[in-house]
């Protein structure tokens, strides 16, 4: 209601400026903060502020003053005590005191050893499989008399030759 009364009391030009401010609020906040800092820091040097920016800063100053008048805290010393005083912690008689963590009795290294051996065994199987596949590939290469590089099968070679012939340029 207070804002509505303020808007009614402002002139039409000021309302247009407020609409502009509302539309560009993020950019305006940065500019307004910058201009206020600049205005406070430069007492002797004149500022290059457009009339529209000056009106905006005046309107915002006015609105902030009105807001601060209406929402002023009651004067007096600041409250140092919290609203609800903190009660000291009291331990109930059936609550047991905190004990430091104790490891259960037994061999602590056993689970880790089991995990390590399982992981090691799976790595060993993978190594054996890769060795086996390498051996099979080597045997296949020896049987065909080919070197170890991969080559296309004969049918694939023929298909690719036909495609090349299809797009060849004939003079």
Swiss-Prot record:
Entry's transmembrane regions: none
GO cellular component, one term: virion component
Primary localisation category: virion
Segments of skewed composition (Basic and acidic residues): 141-160
Signals that turn on the gene: Expressed in the late phase of the viral replicative cycle.
Region described as Disordered: spans on this chain: 68-124, 139-171
Protein name listed in UniProt: Uncharacterized protein H171R
